[in-house]
Amino acid sequence: MKSLLYPHPLSLPSFSSSISTAKPRHLTPPFLKLDSSAVKTPTLAVGAALDSATVNGFSFDTRNPTVSSSYRSSSLPKPNPTVLEAQTRVCTGPTQTKPLGEDQAFKVLDTILRSATGELKDEEPVSRAQLGAFFAAMTIRANCFPEATQWSEGESRAMNKYWPLLVRALPPDVVFIADPEGSLMGIGSSIGPQFVGNGTSEMRLVGALREVLAGGHLGFEEVQGCLRDVLPLKSTTEDGTATGVSESLLSALLIGQRMNRETDRELKAYCLAFDDELGEIPIADVKSLTHYGEPYDGNTRFFRSTLFVAAVRSCYAESSVLHGAEWMPPKGGVTEEQMLKFMGADTSLTPSQAKVLLEDEGVGFAYISHREARPSLYSLVKLREHIKKRPPLATSEKVQQFVKARGKEAIVTGFYHEGYEDSLLMLMKRRGVHSGLVVKGEEGALSMTTRLRPVNSSKGIPVNYCSGFCSLSMASACEIDGVSRQSFNLEVNAVDYGFEPTDTPRTDRSVLKNIELGLTALHGQKGPAYDRIVLNAGMVDHLLGCDGAEGISVALDRAREAIDSGKALERLWNYVKVSKQVRHRPAMCI
């Protein structure tokens, strides 16, 4: 079976010899080389160097590094599936929430009760984070949601039966979240009204939650104060005793603010709260730097092209910083970190080490892990899995500057839910970048597609919708007035620029398939993946106002040349090699 999955490596012919006079340099690791038939029919030849534990000497804590779901850390406790399914329905917005039916409501509350009393034997226990998220959602729905998404009759009957039992079995912090005023459940209780938390950090959090659970909003300083008080999250010590803040309270705050739809000041607080966590932000000596903010939880269906786009743009001095996580809930899809790790790159670079790669004339782009750049926020990975739905951080973490530039800066990110495009652009302007772009991409990602818009597409913002701004001077967005900044909104139709309409290639959580598509395209094989990389490199250059990209056709041709010359592929393998070298350089050399 292993020989079928990982055939012997095939030799790589000189793709660049016929299209470039420069001496070809093939930095492709042996286990990822393609032969001529592999380019015509994209099949990644992964050699015997890949075994169940290592790839090219790189250790994996995964059973199958070719699949995104295997990058979930085995040390993370799993959430209870029964309650998690209910959270999928109720921990969302005032129009998206789907009330539970009576049978499901009874099953969920019975599961919570049996877990609290230690009688749940056939499933994982219901975590404190799950309890906080679920009961916060129920409280907010009862207090301030429209009638259609308030409690169903079945939910009310289930709560009437189980609450007298739950109020005696649940810890006080969860009872507070479920009934903060002591009047919601129909039986008087003094626990909620009198609850203040343990210590000053929880006291601040409880005060904030009273506002959020009633459907209210918090100020900038209040949100930042809560976050800085409790993060990094430390739920238990080595001997198992509790420390830090209650996970139920924190999860209630995160999901509660999302359900209430965050205000601009709340999002700014999340975005900027830990900017100084690692000290002064390094400044790269590059003329142009684009920060790519892909969704941290990855792609589960479609080809993720941004890593390969960054390699293309670096060929003509458009530097890029990519940032994200190895694995992030709720989707747990394919990420740039998984691909780079699979290819043998070092994915634990600090921002200062990333600066070196940006300034390297043979590389020109870098990836920074959330784990290294924002350890406080990264400590929430387990909690984020247990609250199920995306917290405010899922929006704010996409608009970050882990490295700055001496030249112009831009931020590109994607969105899914209508309305968040304006919030993301607001955060970009607050960051002070010269240009910003948000894209309605497939799966909420930032990549444009070459597929045609369906004739019977649903209402709302279409895929390939772009909105952004471009500064006309070197002054930052914080310093210029509206006259000096051009705003734009458009829907990109790839057919208008000579692309054949094609569906986006599917990867379905396969890290291997995503790499295969990207490498095949960078080897010059024309097709949907190649077109998607060219479209996203050229259109981003044009929309951000990059030098040499004033005309769209010129920008697209420049991207094609970077691929067809072999330069983009060389840049990618330069990155793999140099990233490992940078990690071992003395700190004084960086």
Name each region found by the language model.
Residues 2, 51-87, 100, 148-202, ...:
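Glycine-rich anion-binding loops and their surrounding alpha/beta cores
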Residues 114-119, 124-125, 232, 236, ...:
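Short, glycine-rich nucleotide/cofactor-binding loops
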